[in-house]
Amino acid sequence: MIRAILYRGADGQFTGYSAHGHSDYAEEGYDIVCAAVSILGVTCANSLESICGIVPEILENGSGALHYRLPASLSPEAMHDAQVIFGFLHQGLRDVAEQFPQDVNLSIQDWRKKR
């Protein structure tokens, strides 16, 4: 199962994304569920940079995992733009999870900084 997590800050705004696991919907190279989740996550990260000018901090990329978060301080305008992009990601992931509930688990969690 793919576990996708959207993270929110204390103010309720999206601050990061994580996905890991495999759907096993089909064999590697033919798994449309895995491809859908992957392209949504990568497109969000790329759009944050190319459209919004925000370079997300990539924490993990590879081995069936993608994890990134927004930089610590953004202008109100940049944060607004990031929320639009994350809204696209949220809607897309929700659609995939509803269509393939046995293959994708989507959750929204509070962002916890490691101390």
Task: Specify the residue positions occupied by each region the protein language model found.
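N-terminal intrinsically disordered, cationic/polar leader segments
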Residues: M1-I32, V42, N46-R115
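Short, conserved glycine- and acidic-residue-centered signature motifs
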Residues: V33-V37
